[in-house]
C-alpha cells in the first residue's frame, strides 16, 4: 500500500510525497488517514481536546453457547459495571466493558467472568472461544479547522471520540457524502463556497457528537455508589415515548442534516 509521508500546497493544488519518494499532484487532498493523520499534521491543522479519559476498556470477540440473542445489541448496566454484548455477522459476539485493569489479550476465563458478573443472570451463557481481543482508552479530539486551502479533513483525521452511542461511523459517512458534493462543485465550477460550508458545518456537528458521546460514556461508567439510582432512573425514563423517540433520533443522527 502507498503511505503518505508529507504534503505541500502549491498555487493551484497540492503535492503529496509518498514514503517511496514518489510525488503525486492533485487539485485537492482529502486527509482521511485516521486519528494519527500525517497529512493533517503536515498541514499544521491542530487536533485539540482530551488525550485520553481516565477509563480502561476491554474488548473481546467471542463465541458463546446459549444465553444471548443474536439479533440485538444488549447493554447490561450491572452493579459491577457496564457490559455491552453485540452480535457479529459471523455468529460471534463482541463484548466491551469498562474495567480497572484491562488485559492486553483477554482469554476465555476472563470473558466468562465478565458474563457471569455483569451479563444475564436468568440464563447461562458459556464462552467457548476468544476469536480476538484487545484493550483501548478513549480520546476526544476535534480538529481546530477542517480546511486549509487545498487540504480538507474527513473522518477520524478530523474527529475522534468515545464509541458510546455508535456515532463514529455515521459521522464519518456524513463527512464523506457532504465533502463529495462540495468537491464536485469546486472541481466543476471553481466555486469553493461549499467547501467552506463543509468545513464549518461538519466541525460543528463533530463537536456536538463528541459532547453527546462524552455524556453517554459518563452515564455508562458512573461510580458504583450511584449506579442503582442511574439504573432506576433509566428504567423509569424508558416508559416515556418522548424520551425513547428523542434518544433514538439522537443516536441515529436523523435530526441533523
Give short role names for the model-derived ranges.
Residues 38-42, 92-94, 150, 202-206, ...:
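Short, cationic motifs built from Arg/Lys/His that form the positively charged side of catalytic pockets
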Residues 9-11, 172:
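Pyridoxal 5′-phosphate
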Residues 100, 166, 181-257:
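C-terminal helical "tail/cap" subdomain of flavin- and related membrane-associated enzymes
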Residues 31, 130, 134-215:
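Conserved mid-domain beta->alpha element of the FAD-binding
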Residues 8, 86-88, 213:
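Active-site-adjacent segment of FAD-dependent monooxygenases/related oxidoreductases
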Residues 19-28, 32, 148:
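Core beta-strand elements of the Rossmann-like FAD/NAD(P) dinucleotide-binding domain
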Residues 2, 15, 28, 32-134, ...:
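Conserved FAD-binding catalytic core of PHBH/FMO-like flavoproteins
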Residues 1-5, 19-21:
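Conserved SAM/SAH-binding loop
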Amino acid at each position: 500500500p502507498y503511505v503518505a509521508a508529507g504534503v505541500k500546497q502549491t498555487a493551484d493544488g497540492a503535492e503529496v510525497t509518498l514514503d517511496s519518494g514518489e510525488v503525486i499532484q492533485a487539485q485537492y487532498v482529502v486527509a482521511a488517514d485516521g486519528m494519527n493523520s500525517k497529512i493533517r499534521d503536515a498541514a499544521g491543522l491542530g487536533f485539540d481536546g482530551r488525550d485520553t479519559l481516565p477509563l480502561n476498556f476491554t474488548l473481546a470477540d467471542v463465541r458463546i453457547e446459549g444465553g444471548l440473542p443474536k439479533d440485538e445489541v444488549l447493554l447490561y448496566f450491572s452493579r459491577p459495571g457496564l457490559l455491552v454484548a453485540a452480535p457479529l455477522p459471523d455468529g460471534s459476539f463482541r463484548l466491551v466493558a469498562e474495567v480497572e485493569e484491562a488485559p492486553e489479550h483477554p482469554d476465555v476465563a476472563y470473558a466468562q467472568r465478565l458474563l457471569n458478573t455483569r451479563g444475564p443472570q436468568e440464563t447461562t451463557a458459556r464462552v467457548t472461544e476468544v476469536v480476538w481481543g484487545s484493550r483501548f482508552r478513549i480520546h476526544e479530539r476535534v480538529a481546530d479547522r477542517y480546511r486549509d486551502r487545498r487540504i480538507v479533513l474527513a473522518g477520524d483525521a478530523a474527529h475522534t471520540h468515545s464509541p458510546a452511542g455508535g456515532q463514529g461511523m455515521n459521522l464519518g459517512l456524513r463527512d464523506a457524502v457532504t465533502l463529495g458534493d462540495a468537491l464536485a462543485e469546486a472541481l466543476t465550477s471553481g466555486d469553493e463556497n461549499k467547501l467552506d460550508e463543509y468545513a464549518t458545518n461538519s466541525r460543528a456537528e463533530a463537536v456536538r457528537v463528541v459532547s453527546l458521546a462524552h455524556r453517554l460514556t459518563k452515564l455508562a461508567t458512573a461510580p458504583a455508589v450511584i449506579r442503582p439510582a442511574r439504573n432506576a432512573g433509566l428504567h423509569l425514563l424508558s416508559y416515556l415515548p418522548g424520551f425513547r423517540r428523542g434518544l433514538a433520533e439522537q443516536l441515529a443522527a436523523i435530526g441533523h442534516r
